[in-house]
């Protein structure tokens, strides 16, 4: 079973999902009408969160 948690990414509620050896951060940008997913190995979860918090989409 996956472990799902809500975290803040750029002022938006995002999902942090962990299952097995994988982790994923996902959220929607309603202004640009896009859905963003960043995934990687579970041991790099903190790095994935840092990337998500600093991501700029234009």
Q: Can you annotate each of these PLM segments?
A:
Residues 31-58:
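Surface-exposed amphipathic alpha-helical segments
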Residues 1-31:
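Short, solvent-exposed recognition patches
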């Amino acid at each position: 079973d996956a472990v799902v948690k809500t975290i803040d990414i750029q002022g938006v509620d995002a999902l942090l999902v962990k299952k097995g050896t994988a982790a994923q951060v996902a959220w929607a940008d309603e202004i640009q009408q896009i859905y963003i997913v960043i995934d990687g190995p579970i041991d790099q979860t903190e790095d994935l969160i840092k990337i998500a918090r600093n991501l700029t989409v234009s």
